[in-house]
Regions:
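Bacterial Sec-dependent N-terminal signal peptides
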Residues: 1-22
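Beta-rich accessory regions
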Residues: 22-64, 84-86, 90-101, 121, ...
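Surface loop/turn signatures of beta-propeller and other carbohydrate-active proteins
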Residues: 22-33, 64-84, 107-146, 165-168, ...
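Hydrophobic core segments of beta-strands in well-ordered, beta-rich domains
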Residues: 45, 94-95, 144-164, 187-189, ...
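Non-cytosolic beta-sandwich-type ligand-binding/adhesion modules
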Residues: 48-100, 172-179, 228-230, 281, ...
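Repetitive beta-architecture junctions, highlighting loop-to-beta-strand starts
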Residues: 54, 171-173, 222-224, 274-276, ...
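Flexible loop/turn segments at secondary-structure boundaries
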Residues: 164-166, 197-198, 220-222, 275-277, ...
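Beta-propeller blade signature
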Residues: 174-178, 225-232, 279-283, 331-342, ...
Length: 552
């Protein structure tokens, strides 16, 4: 994976970094000002994760507000650095949080000694749990995938990103591109916060040569905004008429727009409290409310958000991500199958029926690529859970996306379900057969009746999987998988219905994750794991395993 900024060796970084020797002007117990000359490209801010956020107002030479950000500035220890781009001299107006901020203490904070000027920012990986073939941010926090589209042979992935730390904050649209859905190249920030608020989740469509982004502006109220790109999605200009949609509904967010070829109209679906609202437009600017869906349908154990609406074969599918309320606690993706006429979605199932797209603990914010080739419906998910996403044992970065998945339709007992299979691109990185599991591999298991699979290492850490042919269930037990200490919600057993018999399982292992699929796409389960050593032992009862390298 290429780096977000200039990639260099640590030794070079030392040679090109200059200690800023910042002298804070302490104005009170929690307040300081720092003037920073330009000199270098970046100001590297030292972060200490256990500290509370410092609120930083960035002003230019005319004392005009440039941006606001929250950074956990280091008090007595530096965990890592984050870059603040210096395109001019700046004044940082910093307000610390907490009750131990005496004037004397603020002057002695280690951040003033450790702040650096630099023309480069080192993104060399220092994390043993960084996945090898899953998309991750090169540094910082990531959650929901946003604005995904395909154009001119390139897959575009935007995502909820914190450029100033590895916990949720400062929501911005990060951006990565790929030609094969596996190898991703990080791009500059796509959309940053403004007077309307930080940038929450949304979508992109292509309209002629333009790429049009729709997103939630998260300020005092959540409103919907748009921006247009004239260069294929690399840079965006915000619409002067923002916001384009407002409401007094709680949790009014995450617009997903698409062209409805059957109705010959643009549609947009977004979350509004415990329902999804559907709009139509002829010009992408003026939107007409058409209908709502969901008050009596599905699971309402948490906030509804991150919707999607699309057609597969002759069925329309509405995705609804919910947090909390998942089948094993925390966040998960439910879906509804039915019909849509451009104005109203009609679910074909009974109101109390709940269908889950993935029965693991770590699969959320699932959305699809707009304009995928060959009528494919390709999705990515955020591979984590809001119960512990901020606590997982990484620091340089947090969170990854799932492998790409193709959706289909199948019937079982007169109900219609969505099938989920690894995208065909995963076969292109399948390497030679090997004898033992490694930290990055694919395991194909041919099953005859019920089966058990045990993955383990020399430390006794293990993941147990069980397929019960009679009960038609598949389960995964990660209670002894490695480091489970960071959250009481992490050690668990997840269980999925298989909707018939399983003939073959495909397991994708990538350092901190296991994704399990049955070959027909009727069962999928995604779980994080944090073993202290890679699982290099496999025991299978009731089947035969073939192990493949993953060519990274």
């Amino acid at each position: 994976m290429k780096k977000l900024m200039t990639t260099i060796a640590a030794a070079v970084l030392v040679a090109t970094s200059v200690q800023a020797q910042v002298q804070p002007n302490v104005l009170g117990e929690n307040h300081a000002m720092v003037r920073v000359e330009q000199g270098k490209k970046y100001l590297l801010l030292p972060v200490q994760e256990k500290e509370e956020n410092a609120h930083i107002a960035v002003l230019n030479g005319k004392n005009e507000m440039v941006k606001r950000l929250n950074v956990r500035l280091a008090v007595d220890k530096v965990d890592y650095f984050v870059p603040l781009e210096l395109n001019q001299a700046m004044l940082l107006d910093i307000t610390f949080q907490g009750d131990r901020r005496t004037t004397g203490a603020v002057k002695d904070f280690v951040c003033w000694k450790e702040i650096k000027h630099s023309d480069t920012f080192d993104t060399t990986n220092r994390e043993k749990f960084r996945p090898a073939y899953h998309h991750t941010p090169v540094y910082g926090w990531m959650n929901d995938p946003n604005g995904m589209f395909y154009k001119d042979g390139v897959w575009h992935l935007y995502y909820q990103f914190n450029p100033y730390g590895s916990q949720w904050e400062n929501m911005t649209w990060g951006h990565s591109t790929s030609k094969d859905l596996i190898h991703w190249e990080a791009q500059p920030l796509a959309i940053e916060s403004d007077w309307l608020g930080t940038i929450f989740s949304g979508s992109c469509v292509t309209n002629g040569n333009d790429v049009v982004a729709f997103y939630t502006s998260a300020g005092h109220h959540q409103t919907q905004s748009m921006a247009v790109s004239k260069d294929g999605g690399l840079t965006f200009e915000k619409f002067s008429g923002n916001p384009i949609l407002t409401s007094d509904a709680p949790d009014f967010r995450d617009p997903k727009a698409f062209w409805n070829e059957e109705a010959k109209v643009w549609n947009l679906i977004l979350a509004a409290g415990q329902e999804m609202r559907i709009y139509s437009s002829k010009d992408l600017k003026a939107w007409k409310y058409e209908s709502s869906f969901g008050k009596e349908y599905g699971n309402h154990g948490g906030v509804w958000e991150c919707p999607d609406l699309f057609k597969i074969d002759n069925k329309w599918v509405l995705l609804c991500n919910i947090n909390p309320g998942g089948p094993f606690g925390g966040s998960a993706t439910q879906y509804f199958v039915g019909d849509f006429d451009g104005k109203k979605f009609t679910c074909e199932s009974m109101p109390k029926v709940t269908k889950w797209m993935d029965y693991g603990k770590d699969h959320y914010a699932t959305v699809s690529f707009y304009n995928a080739p060959a009528n494919r419906r390709v999705v990515l998910a955020w591979m984590s859970n809001w119960q512990y996403a901020n606590q997982v044992p990484t620091k340089q970065f947090r969170s990854a996306n799932s492998i790409p998945r193709d959706l289909g339709i199948f019937k079982y007992n007169e109900e219609t379900y969505v099938s989920v299979k690894p995208s065909e691109e995963m076969l292109a990185v399948r390497g030679q057969k090997i004898k033992k599991p490694t930290e990055t591999c694919e395991i194909v298991i041919d099953v005859k009746g019920s089966a058990t699979i045990e993955l383990s290492n020399a430390k006794g850490e293990q993941v147990m999987m069980n397929y019960d042919a009679q009960k038609q269930t598949f389960s995964m037990d990660r209670t002894k998988s490695g480091d489970v200490s960071f959250s009481e919600a992490f050690p668990c057993v997840t269980t999925a219905p298989t909707y018939g018999s399983i003939r073959q399982l495909r397991l994708f292992i990538d350092r901190c994750s296991i994704e399990a699929f049955d070959s027909d796409g009727k069962m999928v389960m995604t779980n994080l794991v944090f073993p202290n050593e890679p699982y290099n032992i496999i025991k299978v009862k009731g089947g035969k395993a073939t192990i493949f390298e993953i060519n990274k």
